[in-house]
Amino acid sequence: YPVYQDQLTEKKLSVNGRMFEWDKDFSMNLQSATSIFQQSAANGSWITTETVFVGYGIVDSANNDYKGLDVKGKIVVVLEGTRGQGNAANLLNSPTSLNGKINAARNNGAIGLLLVSKDFPKRNASPVTGPMYFTKQATAANNFITVNISEAVASALLGRTSIQNTASLLESKKATYKADLKLVAKKETLNLESSNVLGLIEGSDKKDEYLFITAHYDHLGKRDTVIYYGADDDGSGTVSVLELAEAFVQAKKKGKGPRRTIVFMTVSGEEKGLRGSAYYGNNPTFPLDKTTANLNIDMVGRIDPSYKGDSTNYVYVIGEDKLSSDLMKITDAVNNKFIKMELDRRYNDPKDPNRFYYRSDHYNFAAK
């Protein structure tokens, strides 16, 4: 199936003609890059001659870092963190969080924010690609530029002759600073293709009904110099599908085949947002109204540290009672008679914050 993805092909930042390095001194997401491109005069280049330093950039009942400053139509320079207010910065939309600082900048008329971060050079490569789509579409701009910058970039913008740390930068006057800031962002849309792989064993008297057994065969791949192989997530599920397919083939040869047709399907794009199963749900090979169930296998490598030694004969079971009043009973009966595994249903709790039921490929069957 076709998928489309935007990718940054060029990203540059300079201050007074001095070039800084991607991931060593600055980074941005694709939405901000799109905003830069759309606001640029030509060729994805955006230039300003002044920025406004606003300290931590916090506006709340106790602080207003924008008091007396005109930031309308300008880029603000904001320090990461807060004034020793514990975990308040971790709250998603608190005034001291990144979202809170962006909202404060927007509300005061700024068109962008440069966040001074201590996390440079970055340990892991910043992503240069956006979400995947089934139809060709441009990454939406958020009409606000947000760029993470190093203390070196901030020092140059504030006219320091040497690199200053955050504590020293905080002593700078909240004011407008003259400096030629140039941002360049260009992108292209990649035309990609991915695949779901299907195989089936035809049923007998109910062969026009379909039971799906699924797993995803993609993982995170390579990030910077680290390869994420995905042995558990979800190599374990993929080989389980293959083993089950082989077992049912042997059973059918012995005259003990299934009554319903079993479809064994490995899907791609799960880590990108359940893309493969979503595509199948929108473009089914077999009628969805004749699909009786989907048993999805994800991360069954049994590596949970809470199970040790002889207790590793377990599996987490999630979602069997969401749409069916019989599946849990069947699961328990078959397990008690044959497998005798520990069926751990802790993550099936609707109040569980992980919400695993909504985070793997079975959900695209359930949603239909």
Predicted segments with their positions:
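Noncatalytic luminal/extracellular "stalk/propeptide" segments of secretory-pathway proteins
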Residues: 1-75, 80-84, 330
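Protein/peptide-recognition domains central to ubiquitin and immune signaling
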Residues: 1-35, 102, 115-134, 148, ...
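Metal-dependent peptidase/peptidase-like ectodomains
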Residues: 28-29, 144-156, 161, 267-368
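Soluble metallo-hydrolase cores and metallopeptidase-like ectodomains found primarily
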Residues: 32-68, 139-230, 246, 250-256
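Mature extracellular/periplasmic domains of secretome proteins
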Residues: 42, 66-71, 102-111, 128-137, ...
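Structural recognition of the beta-strand scaffold that forms the well-ordered cores
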Residues: 51-54, 75-79, 112-116, 145-148, ...
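A conserved hydrophobic secondary-structure block that centers on an alpha-helix together
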Residues: 52-124
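Short helix-loop-beta-strand segments that form the rim/entrance of peptidase-like active sites
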Residues: 246-273, 297
